[in-house]
From Swiss-Prot:
Name under which the protein is recorded: RNA pyrophosphohydrolase
Organism: Methylococcus capsulatus (strain ATCC 33009 / NCIMB 11132 / Bath)
E.C. numbers: 3.6.1.-
Function text: Accelerates the degradation of transcripts by removing pyrophosphate from the 5'-end of triphosphorylated RNA, leading to a more labile monophosphorylated state that can stimulate subsequent ribonuclease cleavage.
SUPFAM superfamilies, per database record: Nudix
Length: 191
């Protein structure tokens, strides 16, 4: 669904694990990585769209996640000129998104990238909370910064004040440190 200004209504999903790391996925057949996201259909509310996209792209059903929070309003990004399809109607110039932060209550084994005819992703990993800012395609970076910044407080609410677990290379939580305010490096555990 595209609004009157040319923005496609969309949901973005930040899936976190118990260690405060986030799900990061590589687009099928490409080198780019991103959070799961997808369009909102006509007569579909954002929550329903989020659960549908979560299943289609990540294979997770609602019983395997907990909604922690969502952004208060819409976050927007504009597509670079070369990605705008001028001959399509209605014209889409970008995305207008509600972002969610979820906690995985199931296990990594519940994540399946093959739940749709054309999978969106072909690989995934857990990364440090701020890592996506250094890795996402440039035109989505500001929206990612806004979503991560707004939703960080909600994620921290269930943890010791100002701390998140940090994992060693084996994926075991080793210590508590203050939550970083700057992007940090990638995870070593990739699927």
């Amino acid at each position: 669904m595209i609004d009157a200004e040319g923005y496609r209504l969309n949901v973005g999903i930040i899936l976190s694990n118990d260690e405060g790391r986030v799900f990061w996925a590589r687009r099928a057949g490409m080198r780019s990585w991103q959070f799961p996201q997808g369009g909102i259909k006509v007569d579909e509310d954002p929550d329903a769209a989020m659960f549908r996209e979560l299943y289609e792209e990540v294979g997770l059903e609602r019983q395997y996640v907990e909604i922690i929070a969502r952004t208060k309003g819409w976050l927007r990004y504009q597509l670079p000129e070369r990605f705008i399809r001028r001959r399509s109607y209605p014209l889409c110039i970008g995305q207008k998104q509600i972002w969610y932060i979820l906690r995985l209550t199931g296990t990594d084994a519940n994540i399946r990238l093959d739940c749709s005819e054309r999978p969106e992703f072909d690989r995934w990993c857990w990364v440090d909370y701020w890592h996506p800012l250094s890795d996402v395609v440039y035109f989505k970076r500001e929206v990612y910064r806004q979503a991560l910044s707004e939703l960080q407080r909600a994620l921290q609410a269930g943890r010791p004040a100002g701390a998140q677990a940090v994992s060693d290379a084996g994926g075991t939580a080793t210590r508590q440190i203050p939550v970083a305010t700057e992007p940090s490096g990638p995870s070593s555990s990739q699927r």
